[in-house]
C-alpha cells in the first residue's frame, strides 16, 4: 500500500480535461494487465500541479452561498424535473400498492431519471420497508423520525415481494429505516422480505441497503444469509465527521464492523458496498484515510456523491466538490483494489447506472465460478 501522502499527490491533482457527472458511472474493474496499470501511473505522474494547488484551487470545489450572499448551484448540480409517462405509471403503482420509496422520502435528485427509465429504458425504484418513520435523526436525512414509530406491517414482506416480482425488473434495491424500537432492529422483517422475493423470483438480483442494527452480529448474520446478492451499509461520511453528520447511535467503527461481519457471514460471491457523501466539510486526506479503512474491511464497491441539503432544517452544504475531484477519487479507489467505484456529484448509494454494472459483474462472477450461483 502506498503512503497516504503519495496517494494524495498522485491522484488528487487537476486533470487536463473536464469530467461531467455522467462519467461517474463508467464501469471500472481492477483486474488490469500490468502494462495498462503502468500506463495509468505514468499518465498521472506526468501531471505537474501540486496537491496544494488542487485542494485550494477551483479544481476541487466551489464556494457555497449564504443567506446574505446567495450563490447559484454549479452547473453540474442541475437536476432534471421528474416527469414522463413511465414516471407517472410507477408513481401510481407505488401508491396503489402502498409502498414507500427512499427515492421520495430522501428527495433523491435522480428520481426523475430512475423512474422514467433513463438511458437504459427500464424504470427502477428503491423500496423502503419497515415503515416510513425512522427512530434516528441524522442531520442530512429527510426521512420522518419518531422514538415510537408505528409497528411494522406483518404482511409487508409478502406484499412487497409480490409487488416487486410483478414488475419484471431483474435487479432491485431494498432498504429500510432504522428501527431501534424493535428487539431485533427489524432484521427478521428484512430477511423475510428478501427470502420471499427470492422464492417468487429466484433469478432476481437483490441489493439490501441495511441499517447498522446497533452492531448486533446476530442481526447482521440473519440478513446476510437471507439470499441477497449485495449487502450495502453506508458509512455516510469520513470518520472525523461522524458525530456531526449522523445520529449519536451511529459511528464509524460500528458501521465498519457491520461490513466486516457481512463479508464473513454471507455466502461466497456476495458483494459488500458502502457510500460516502462529499461536501460535508471533509478534507481530501480524511477521504483517503476513510477509503483505506473501508477497503481493509473487505468492501467490494464504494460510491461517492455530493451532499445536497434537503431543507433548511438540515445541515448546510459545506462545498460543492467538482466532477474532476470526484473522478480523482474514482481512480484512487480503482488503484486501492475496489472492484467498482461510482463517483460523481449526482451519484447516490442506489444509483441506477451503478446497479446495472454491479449486475453484470455478479453475472460474470457466476459464469467464472458456477459454485457461487444461487
From Swiss-Prot:
Residues engaged in binding [4Fe-4S] cluster 1: 103, 108, 114, 350
Principal EC category: transferase
Compartmental location: Mitochondrion
Gene Ontology terms: cellular component: mitochondrial matrix
Expression sites (tissue/organ): Expressed in leaves and flowers, but not in roots. Expressed in roots, rosette leaves, cauline leaves, stems, flowers and siliques.
Major site of localization recorded for this protein: mitochondrion
CDD domains (alphabetical): Radical_SAM
Ranges annotated as spanning the membrane: none
Residue range covered by the transit peptide: 1-19
Role played: Together with LIP2 is essential for mitochondrial protein lipoylation during seed development. Required for the lipoylation of mitochondrial pyruvate dehydrogenase component E2 proteins in leaves and roots.
Protein name: Lipoyl synthase, mitochondrial
Amino acid at each position: 500500500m502506498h503512503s497516504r501522502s503519495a496517494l494524495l499527490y498522485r491522484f488528487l491533482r487537476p486533470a487536463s480535461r473536464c469530467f461531467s457527472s455522467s462519467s461517474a458511472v463508467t464501469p471500472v474493474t481492477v483486474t488490469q494487465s500490468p502494462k495498462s496499470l503502468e500506463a495509468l501511473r505514468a499518465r498521472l505522474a506526468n501531471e505537474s500541479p501540486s496537491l496544494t494547488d488542487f485542494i485550494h484551487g477551483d479544481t476541487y470545489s466551489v464556494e457555497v452561498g449564504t443567506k446574505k450572499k446567495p450563490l447559484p448551484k454549479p452547473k453540474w448540480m442541475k437536476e432534471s424535473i421528474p416527469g414522463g409517462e413511465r414516471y407517472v405509471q410507477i408513481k401510481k403503482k407505488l401508491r396503489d400498492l402502498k409502498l414507500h420509496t427512499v427515492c421520495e422520502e430522501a428527495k433523491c435528485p435522480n428520481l426523475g431519471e430512475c423512474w422514467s427509465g433513463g438511458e437504459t429504458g427500464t424504470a427502477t425504484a428503491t423500496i423502503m420497508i419497515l415503515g416510513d418513520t425512522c427512530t434516528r435523526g441524522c442531520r442530512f436525512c429527510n426521512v420522518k423520525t419518531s422514538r415510537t414509530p408505528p409497528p411494522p406491517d406483518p404482511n409487508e414482506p409478502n406484499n412487497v415481494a409480490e409487488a416487486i416480482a410483478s414488475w419484471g425488473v431483474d435487479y432491485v434495491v431494498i432498504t429500510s429505516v432504522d428501527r431501534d424500537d424493535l428487539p431485533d432492529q427489524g432484521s427478521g422483517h428484512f430477511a423475510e422480505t428478501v427470502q420471499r422475493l427470492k422464492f417468487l423470483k429466484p433469478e432476481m438480483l437483490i441489493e439490501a441497503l441495511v441499517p447498522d442494527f446497533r452492531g448486533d452480529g446476530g442481526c447482521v448474520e440473519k440478513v446476510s444469509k437471507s439470499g441477497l446478492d449485495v449487502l450495502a451499509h453506508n458509512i455516510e461520511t469520513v470518520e472525523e465527521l461522524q458525530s456531526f453528520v449522523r445520529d449519536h447511535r451511529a459511528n464509524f467503527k460500528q458501521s465498519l464492523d457491520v461490513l466486516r461481519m457481512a463479508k464473513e457471514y454471507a455466502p461466497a460471491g456476495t458483494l459488500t458496498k458502502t457510500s460516502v457523501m462529499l461536501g460535508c466539510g471533509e478534507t481530501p486526506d480524511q477521504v483517503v484515510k476513510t477509503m483505506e479503512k473501508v477497503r481493509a474491511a473487505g468492501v467490494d464497491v464504494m460510491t461517492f456523491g455530493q451532499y445536497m441539503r434537503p431543507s433548511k432544517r438540515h445541515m448546510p452544504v459545506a462545498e460543492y466538490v467538482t466532477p474532476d475531484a470526484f473522478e480523482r477519487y474514482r481512480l484512487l479507489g480503482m488503484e486501492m483494489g475496489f472492484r467498482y467505484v461510482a463517483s460523481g456529484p449526482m451519484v447516490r448509494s442506489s444509483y441506477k447506472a451503478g446497479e446495472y454494472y454491479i449486475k453484470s459483474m455478479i453475472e460474470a462472477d457466476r459464469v467464472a465460478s458456477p459454485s457461487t450461483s444461487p
